Amino acid sequence: MKETGVGYLNSQAEEVIDFQYEPYMGIMSSGLFYEGYAIVKSDGLFGIIDTAGNYKISAQYKQLIRLEDLYGSRQGDHWSILSLTKDSITPALFASINALGDGFVLYKENGKYGMMDAEMNAILPPVYRVIKKFRDYFVTLGCGNDL
């Protein structure tokens, strides 16, 4: 499957992980190893492997994205946030998620935005219409009745 599959070579161009995975949109960023882990696709589902090719998270998710030190997984219409360092996962509550940089994750719950840190602690509750990062601070717009 080397002609169409995805595998990994070391710096001497020696195969270290067999070409057994499927290509996917965004593989040249999400499929790269980060802190010893990479997102792979197998049988149409996404999982996470280590540098030896062992699954840390089996291929079980419809979609999987890296959010700096966290990962986002989608099952159905909602997202969960996974932490490999804490071996934990949030309930699938979020309509959308996105990395804001510096370890912060933006999430949308019940039509409103909130923010959490890399330790999965809520920094801002989901009560905002908009949260944007601008240089080294955040700009928020509340969801008050007069907006």
Predicted regions: what is each one?
Residues 1-147:
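Residue-level detector of conserved, function-critical positions
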